Amino acid sequence: LFGGQFVKLCVNGGSSFDHKQMMELAFSTHDVRRVLYGIDLDALTYFYKTPNHETPNYLYDDDLLNDVAYWFNAGVLAKYIPQCLMTLGQSDPDQVDTMYMWSDLFTYGKDAVLPGYTFSTRRVEQRDAGEKPTLSYQFQMNVQHNFLPYIEQHPDTQFMFFFPPYSLLSWYQAYENGTLELDLHQKQALIEVLLAYDNVQ
């Protein structure tokens, strides 16, 4: 679709700090021409230096000596190394596109979701989002520390940001919580900040 070679980097429920760590590694080791980045609004609600998952940083540095505890860990020796060795010489070209897929673990559709949900006809007062879309302080900090440094330091890299589609129930829950207008304003403000850069789509 976009040409070139891509690597899919996923962090389950990752914060923007988790994604920053992946970008740091990618840019420090490769010539990155294009970044496709799915922005989850919830990921921007974490403190900008807070990982949602602790990264074993010792595995990502250049010091081989501090990897000893990993390599000689009983679980790694007994389980993971044999699994890796069994795949030597094998090729599964589809695996790159299907890794981290978990959609088959769940049932989808209105018949699966709606029976457990009660809808209300009451009008919910929404939090005041202001007239002009403006990033909240938390969003600002995440964008300034975890997005913009890479966009600004790599003007030849094309950054393509997108919002993964949320279900209608997610938006209804935002309405029920009184944050629907605020969430939509945050999205709009984020779009305006990012699109100010020539290397962003």
Protein language model features and the residues they cover:
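Second-shell loop/turn segments in exported
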Residues: 8-13, 130-137, 174-179
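Loop/turn elements at helix/coil->beta-strand transitions in domains of secreted/extracellular proteins
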Residues: 4-5, 31-34, 154-159, 198-200
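N-terminal cationic-hydrophobic initiation segments that often serve targeting/anchoring roles
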Residues: 27, 151-152, 191-195
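Active-site segments of SGNH/GDSL-like serine hydrolases
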Residues: 151-178
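A short, Lys/Arg-enriched amphipathic alpha-helix followed by its capping loop at the start of a domain
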Residues: 2-6, 150, 193
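Secreted/periplasmic serine-hydrolase-like ester/acetyl group-modifying domain
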Residues: 39, 52-160
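Substrate-gating cap/lid alpha-helix
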Residues: 170-200
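Membrane-embedded segments
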Residues: 1-71
